[in-house]
A protein has these predicted regions:
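Topogenic membrane-insertion module of multi-pass membrane proteins
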Residues: 1-49, 172-182
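Short, amphipathic, aromatic/basic-enriched membrane-interface segments that mark the entry/exit
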Residues: 1-10, 64-72, 127-133, 182
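Multi-pass membrane catalytic core of lipid/isoprenoid biosynthesis enzymes
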Residues: 8-13, 54-111
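Lipid-exposed faces of alpha-helical membrane segments in multi-pass integral membrane proteins
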Residues: 11-17, 37-40, 76-79, 98-105, ...
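Helix-coil boundary and interhelical linker segments in multi-pass alpha-helical membrane proteins
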Residues: 21-36, 76, 80-101, 146-162
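Transmembrane alpha-helical segments that form the membrane-embedded catalytic/substrate-channel core
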Residues: 45, 104-117, 167-181
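Cytosolic, membrane-interface loops and tails of multi-pass inner-membrane proteins
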Residues: 47-63, 113-130
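C-terminal membrane-associated helical module and adjoining short loops/tails
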Residues: 122-182
Length: 182
């Protein structure tokens, strides 16, 4: 079998499975429950790197595989899945579709940029990163569920505000600023 198999990728794959389940829930009209899957995927992503770094004697190939598999799973979990969720919530007009495609594209650009910069950084140092460059794509796993809790307060404005929220998040993925890691 190709790939690298150890406990270091379990949380990454668990987050991916949660996103897959969330997409199925969304397709079947259960977007509210799918939001829990999105949040759970974010929780898994928060700790997968910490778990991976606990393995002693990781090879360079294992490290590079970890960076790539994490970002590929992030495209699904925090790019495609939220796009599908927002589409199911009503972002279906021309403006909504353009915003969703922009959001996904910005997320992919952000992840590809991260991969290049992280591999370079790891070649130069073993120190942990202290800052994010741009808004991490995982942030949607907090932003979207919290935003959806405002639905009763926003009433008929919810959909227009959702458009603004997703557009803003997509822009923050690719705007160059530093955000201190927690």
């Amino acid at each position: 079998m190709i790939g690298f198999y150890s406990y270091t990728v379990i949380l990454t794959y668990l987050g991916l499975a949660s996103a897959a389940l969330g997409m199925m829930l969304t397709f079947n009209g259960f977007a509210r429950y799918a939001l829990f899957c999105l949040a759970f995927s974010g929780l898994c992503d928060m700790f997968d790197g910490k778990v991976a770094r606990t393995k002693a004697n990781r090879t360079e190939d294992e490290k590079r595989f970890g960076i790539q598999i994490d970002s590929l799973c992030d495209v699904v979990c925090f790019g495609a899945f939220p796009m599908i969720l927002c589409y199911s919530m009503g972002m279906r007009g021309i403006a909504g579709i353009c915003i969703l495609v922009f959001y996904l594209t910005a997320g992919v650009i952000r992840l590809a940029f991260f991969n290049v910069m992280e591999e370079r950084r790891q070649d130069e140092t073993d120190e942990a990163r202290k800052y994010y460059q741009g808004l991490p794509i995982t942030s949607i796993s907090i932003i979207l569920p919290l935003f959806c809790t405002l639905r009763p307060l926003l009433g008929h404005r919810f959909l227009s505000e959702l458009h603004i929220c997703i557009l803003t998040v997509g822009l923050l993925f690719i705007i160059n600023f530093q955000l201190k890691k927690p």
